[in-house]
């Protein structure tokens, strides 16, 4: 594009700044929604991954119908690829909560260590220091809480105490929401989760083993690479467990299960929430991009029509079609680039945090983790620029094919024609003059009509 046309382009931006801002604004909104909503899914999952890593969430959990002793833990802990393994005792019991009989799940926990697997974090109160004390999972505002100081009457042969006083509230990566595992006790639905000292259990066998896998923490836990590391180790654990079946053969019917995170409801549920946000991002911002294209098409068509004589003069002076079209394409390109860049910044700074905090009403993922989104921003800006450049080219293509002589003359008005409603006398004759003019304007100027319909639908 020649220097004179470049100057004329910037002069046109200054002269028609309102039009420039209209393209800039709709692109900004569209790109902000696309990058903000689309990146929210990634931010949510990476935040969960960081939370899981910081609190040592299990990679594998193991069950058997006879439980485990220390020798079993030692045996399975020697499996190639296992980093750490811990035994936990858990039971499901019925207690009275808020004047209702509800099922609670109780886990043993070593409160003397600050590096356990499935590490719990104190959010209120204190950890148990005396027999008959417990902490309860803090589920925020999702449901009516059990207050500190509440005495829970729990009678079970596996427990040394018959009641437990709630002295603290904790968060745990094992459960992210108030949806817990199912149980065969009571109604089959677990209402609350308690943690008590290991010494509070009467038995010396563990009901579940949790293990971490070497190198798994270095990978993104919702990615395929993570499971490529964990799955082979899970298979080796199952092979090693065959020797345990010989040990417990006399009991008859020995069963053993090794499960990864994909079998854990809370892990999968949070992933599905992120996937739903990703699905929304594929549809919702499309309306803004479509409106952006229509706004650009309408704006640039009007500009080209107004400058019909100027285009004819440029052609008469020897400027080729590409150079003349370049003026208007540059106009739309600059508006789209500016709106796209600012839209990316605003979208990434606002929407992910708002969406993350909104989901955190239900889920307890501690910290928001930021992840680079360069490729996504590039894609969002590229789509916006491409759509508007094509719309601009379409708006000036027909005029550029005309000769300078035709362009220097005023444009002939469109031939009058009836709209389809005029062929339906029963309807048309009931319209007053204003309604007839409105109907003709709507149905004859189809670009404006579809822009209005799309904007309202979006």
What is the role of each PLM region?
Residues 1-35, 329, 417-458:
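N-terminal Sec/SRP start-transfer signal
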Residues 2-293, 302, 321, 356, ...:
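Membrane transport/envelope proteins' first extracytoplasmic loop
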Residues 3, 400-419:
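Short cytosolic juxtamembrane segments of multi-pass membrane proteins
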Residues 8, 12-18, 294-334:
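Interfacial "coupling" helices/loops that link adjacent transmembrane helices in transporter permeases
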Residues 21, 25, 280-283, 287, ...:
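Alpha-helical transmembrane segments of multi-pass inner-membrane proteins
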Residues 41, 45, 49, 392-405:
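Juxtamembrane/interface segments at transmembrane-helix termini
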Residues 272-285, 309, 313, 325-334, ...:
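Internal alpha-helical transmembrane segments of multi-pass membrane proteins, especially GPCRs
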Residues 293, 297-302, 309, 333-365, ...:
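Small-residue-rich transmembrane alpha-helices
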């Amino acid at each position: 594009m020649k220097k004179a046309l470049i100057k004329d382009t910037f002069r046109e931006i200054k002269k028609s700044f309102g039009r420039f801002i209209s393209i800039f604004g709709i692109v900004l909104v569209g790109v902000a929604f696309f990058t903000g909503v689309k990146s929210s899914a990634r931010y949510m999952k990476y935040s969960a991954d960081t939370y899981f890593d910081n609190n040592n969430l299990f990679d594998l959990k193991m069950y058997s119908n006879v439980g485990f002793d220390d020798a079993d833990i030692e045996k399975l802990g020697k499996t190639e690829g296992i980093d750490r393994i811990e035994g936990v005792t858990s039971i499901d019991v019925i207690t009275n909560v808020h004047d209702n009989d509800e099922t609670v799940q109780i886990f043993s926990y070593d409160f003397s260590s600050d590096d356990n697997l499935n590490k719990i974090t104190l959010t209120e109160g204190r950890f148990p220091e005396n027999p008959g004390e417990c902490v309860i999972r803090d589920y925020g505002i999702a449901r009516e809480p059990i207050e500190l100081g509440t005495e829970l009457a729990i009678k079970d042969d596996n427990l040394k105490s018959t009641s437990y006083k709630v002295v603290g509230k904790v968060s745990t990566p094992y459960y992210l929401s108030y949806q817990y595992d199912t149980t065969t006790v009571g109604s089959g639905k677990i209402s609350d989760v308690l943690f008590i000292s290991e010494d509070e259990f009467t038995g010396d066998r563990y009901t579940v083993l949790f293990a971490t896998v070497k190198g798994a923490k270095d990978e993104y836990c919702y990615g395929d690479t993570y499971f490529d590391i964990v799955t082979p180790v899970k298979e080796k654990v199952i092979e090693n467990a065959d020797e345990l079946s010989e040990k417990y053969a006399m009991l008859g019917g020995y069963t053993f299960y090794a499960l990864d995170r994909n079998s854990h409801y809370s892990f999968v549920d949070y992933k599905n929430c992120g996937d739903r946000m990703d699905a929304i991002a594929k549809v919702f911002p499309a309306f803004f991009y479509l409106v952006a294209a229509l706004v650009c098409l309408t704006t640039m068509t009007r500009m080209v029509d107004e400058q019909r004589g100027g285009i004819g003069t440029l052609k008469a002076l020897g400027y080729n079609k590409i150079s003349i079209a370049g003026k208007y394409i540059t106009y739309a390109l600059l508006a789209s680039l500016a709106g796209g860049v600012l839209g990316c910044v605003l979208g990434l700074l606002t929407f992910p945090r708002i969406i993350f905090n909104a989901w955190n009403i239900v889920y307890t993922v501690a910290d928001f983790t930021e992840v680079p989104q360069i490729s996504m921003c590039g894609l969002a800006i590229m789509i916006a620029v491409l759509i508007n450049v094509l719309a601009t080219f379409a708006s000036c293509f027909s005029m550029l094919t005309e000769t300078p002589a035709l362009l220097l003359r005023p444009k002939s008005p469109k031939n009058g024609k009836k709209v389809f409603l005029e062929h339906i006398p029963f309807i048309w004759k009931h319209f007053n003059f204003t309604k007839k003019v409105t109907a003709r304007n709507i149905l004859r100027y189809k670009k404006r009509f579809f822009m209005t319909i799309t904007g309202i639908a979006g």
